[in-house]
């Protein structure tokens, strides 16, 4: 059994402060280098643009605030993040707010994750569990859209921290503290808090069946509110209309029926790890682990049935499949707990451990991974019941050798991928960041193996020289983490510092209106201080606003017809590869775009495309202080597209624009 604190059903982390020695403090502090290295900061990008952009829009209602995404915002009112960002923007720049929130978020998350780990196991077993949580794949759902513990300025990271802290408190017997933290999670991000509430409900009912009364009353109240058509709750019984659903289908990650089979591999190893670790833990911990898996499975099935096949507006918007985030974290922690517990069970446990390792390593073959997961659980259950056959040493060695061989092959593939990345970057002048290097995953297997081994080897058996080497390595890792955590490129730094922004705004002119920045990544908001006519970021919140979805889709159709965006800019999940060539803008397309009833102000096109301006229109070239470099997976290769100059075309007043239909 995994080493637990023996105190009945009480919290394994209930230890006195005096028990904290300098060694224990150093052990847990050593997680900081892992955090900094495994969660590098990429800048104001991804969903941070939504939340920081919301704050910028609040402070600039006549400018960025007119952007259609903020004008039809139905998302931010459910989170206190909007107020937090707006307050910080009063004294800091958007870039500074983004970095501050990202750093604060992951540090709070680490503290909460450590607290939860100490409620599941103790000592180095708990430490190894957190290491596995940090280094094993953190993605949940499909297409790598979401991960837990993201170092970006979103409310998700704070909600995750509050959920983990709340569950740790509940497992420790601190019920009020736990419920308060779960309430804080709801305040930051209700969707991320829901699985925590589900697991908390299971723990409370397990302790006292009388909790079924208030929980049942809460469910009945929700159903009654839906039946009475009260605001928000009425969406539960409203089917999503075809037009809105068709627009949303472009975001395939929202709908489990459209997920690739590779998702099953991740699901399989995490469920197998939870099943094994739960059986080796104290009853309360086992109930927590299995409850987490059950909540995740229930949420995914509900999302498939009522948010996908027969979609209800509310269930679709709740994205119940996102309950997988908690299973992802707990499943990765369970990999360490299961490995430690299985190793201590002798040959039969070693054989089960080999099967579990092969389940994880066979992620490229979903069918095989699922079979191995089932075999892992079946063999382990038989072993626990004493029904498994006695294995010869040769069988155990063969299974372990197979796992080691596959691990070596996996490392070789990761090394080849890293080599390809470096060689492609050198050949094309593309920037290489630590975030890109760490995302290859070359470090995953060695770090997991080292963490589990360190938890198994008695400390007294570790030579002093090895202890010194380990301490020196961690110190070096801390220095490296501090230096490498800020993984922003020169281009990203230039954009966030708004270098050259004044010159660009002069070229755009004073005419109010939206701008179309082709291939933009929210530069219109943070660089040009303008509302964007269209960008991919605006396509994220369309799930929460039908008006935004329709307007965004109409504009996407217009730009596709004018060849001012690519199909993959509108539906990136249909084909993850992207073309590395630049869009060629034509005068007829510019003229037709500028005739749009929304009265756009300008077009910013990549490259030197002076011929794109209709005769007599104002056109200029703008060179950013740092060239823009875009990374693409195009066909069979990796490519960087470097853009050193942009073409800025001012739109004429709408009454002066004639817009014949452009030829394809």
Segments from the language model and where they lie:
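Membrane-interface transmembrane helices that cradle and orient dolichyl/undecaprenyl
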Residues: 14, 158-177
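Active-site lumenal/periplasmic loops and adjacent helix-entry segments of GT-C-fold
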Residues: 20-24, 31-110, 116-133, 141-159, ...
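Membrane-interface alpha helices of multi-pass inner-membrane proteins
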Residues: 167-169, 176-190, 196-203, 219-221, ...
């Amino acid at each position: 059994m995994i080493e637990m604190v023996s105190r009945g059903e009480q919290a394994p982390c209930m230890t006195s402060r005096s028990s904290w020695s300098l060694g224990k403090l150093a052990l847990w502090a050593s997680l900081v280098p892992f955090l900094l290295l495994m969660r590098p900061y990429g800048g104001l990008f991804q969903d941070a643009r939504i939340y920081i952009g919301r704050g910028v829009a609040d402070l600039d209602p006549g400018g960025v605030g007119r952007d259609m995404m903020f004008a039809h915002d139905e998302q931010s009112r459910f989170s206190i993040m909007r107020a937090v960002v707006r307050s910080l923007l009063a004294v800091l720049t958007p870039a500074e707010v983004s970095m501050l929130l990202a750093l604060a978020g992951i540090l709070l998350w680490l503290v909460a994750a450590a607290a939860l780990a100490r409620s599941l196991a103790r000592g180095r077993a708990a430490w190894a569990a957190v290491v596995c949580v940090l280094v094993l794949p953190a993605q949940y759902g499909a297409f790598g859209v979401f991960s837990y513990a993201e170092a970006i300025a979103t409310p998700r990271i704070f909600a995750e921290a509050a959920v983990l802290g709340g569950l740790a408190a509940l497992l420790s017997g601190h019920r009020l503290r736990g419920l308060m933290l779960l309430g804080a999670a709801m305040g930051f991000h209700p969707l991320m808090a829901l699985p925590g509430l589900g697991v908390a409900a299971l723990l409370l009912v397990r302790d006292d069946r009388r909790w079924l009364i208030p929980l049942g009353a809460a469910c009945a109240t929700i159903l009654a509110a839906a039946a009475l058509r009260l605001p928000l709750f009425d969406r539960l019984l409203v089917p999503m209309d075809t037009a809105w659903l068709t627009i949303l289908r472009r975001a395939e990650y929202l709908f489990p029926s459209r997920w690739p089979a590779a998702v099953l591999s991740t699901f399989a190893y995490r469920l197998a790890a939870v099943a094994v670790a739960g059986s080796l833990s104290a009853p309360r911990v086992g109930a927590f682990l299995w409850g987490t898996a059950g909540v995740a499975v229930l949420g995914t099935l509900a999302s498939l049935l009522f948010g996908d096949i027969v979609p209800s507006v509310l269930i679709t918007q709740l994205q119940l499949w996102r309950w997988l985030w908690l299973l992802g974290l707990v499943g990765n922690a369970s990999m360490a707990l299961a490995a430690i517990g299985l190793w201590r069970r002798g040959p039969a446990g070693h054989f089960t451990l080999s099967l579990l390792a092969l389940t994880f390593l066979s992620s490229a073959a979903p069918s095989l991974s699922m079979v191995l997961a089932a075999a892992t659980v079946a063999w382990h259950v038989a072993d626990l019941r004493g029904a498994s056959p006695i294995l010869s040493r040769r069988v155990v060695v063969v299974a372990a050798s197979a796992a080691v061989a596959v691990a070596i092959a996996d490392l070789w593939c990761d090394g080849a991928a890293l080599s390809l990345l470096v060689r492609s970057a050198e050949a094309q002048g593309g920037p290489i960041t630590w975030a890109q290097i760490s995302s290859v995953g070359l470090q995953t297997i060695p770090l997991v193996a080292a963490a589990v081994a360190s938890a198994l080897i008695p400390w007294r058996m570790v030579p002093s020289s090895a202890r010194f080497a380990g301490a020196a390595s961690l110190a070096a890792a801390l220095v490296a983490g501090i230096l490498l955590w800020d993984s922003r490129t020169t281009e990203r730094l230039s954009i966030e510092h708004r270098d050259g922004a004044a010159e660009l705004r002069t070229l755009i002119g004073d005419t109010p209106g939206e701008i179309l920045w082709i291939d933009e990544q929210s530069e219109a908001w943070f660089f040009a201080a303008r509302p964007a006519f269209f960008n991919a970021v605006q396509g994220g919140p369309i799930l929460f606003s039908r008006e935004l979805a329709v307007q965004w889709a109409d504009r996407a159709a217009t730009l596709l017809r004018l060849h001012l965006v690519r199909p993959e800019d509108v539906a990136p999940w249909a084909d993850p590869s992207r073309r590395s060539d630049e869009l060629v803008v034509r005068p007829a397309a510019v003229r037709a775009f500028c005739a749009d009833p929304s009265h756009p102000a300008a077009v910013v096109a990549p490259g030197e495309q002076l011929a794109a301006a209709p005769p007599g229109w104002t056109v200029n070239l703008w060179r950013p202080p740092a060239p823009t470099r875009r990374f693409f997976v195009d066909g069979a290769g990796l490519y960087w597209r470097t853009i050193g100059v942009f073409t800025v075309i001012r739109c004429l007043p709408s009454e002066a624009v004639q817009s014949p239909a452009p030829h394809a």
